Amino acid sequence: MGIKETLLSFMKEEAYRPMDIQELVSVFDISPDEYKVFKKTLKIMELEGSIVRTNKDKFAVPERLGLIKGRIQSHKKGFGFLIPEEDGERDVFIPSSFINGAMNNDRVIVQITRDDVNGKKREGEVIEILERANTKIIGVYEDSRNFGFVVPEDTRLNQDIFISKKDKNGANHGDIVIAEVTKWPDKRRSPEGVIK
């Protein structure tokens, strides 16, 4: 069993409580020579979403912290659903105010904010985007005086892509174009891109 599998198995044990890197080094008896590789392994596992780091710099598997990994299925009105990776796990409704810059089909980690109550579906909030699904977006270029934007053809991508004048690369109003996303959206900002 490799170090990743050993760490995952350990963190999934019922008695496991989130630990920081020094505690894990002590438990696994990691030598100074092995430390760099061990730390890098934790970072890779975190990027993959198999473990998460709490705000106190402790590591745990997402499920033990009430977190769920999956893909976002967006609706043109701005809300979405998390389609969980874990078999048997039910979908989670994500209100538009809790989508936090995630776009359709992005792989994310969601924190449950409300469980099933009185027939209402459980709800969650995107707390981390693990992998972006839409790096190039097809849409209609719309020009304005100081900038332009691309309105995606896929209505599930419900945010226009801002295009600066220098990045329009000869596109004219009404052209069907491909925009490559250069800055991802967040709560307060639309995605930015360049016309290819």
Feature map (PLM): residue ranges:
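Charge-lined substrate channels and their catalytic hotspots, especially those that engage the 3′ end
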Residues: 1-196
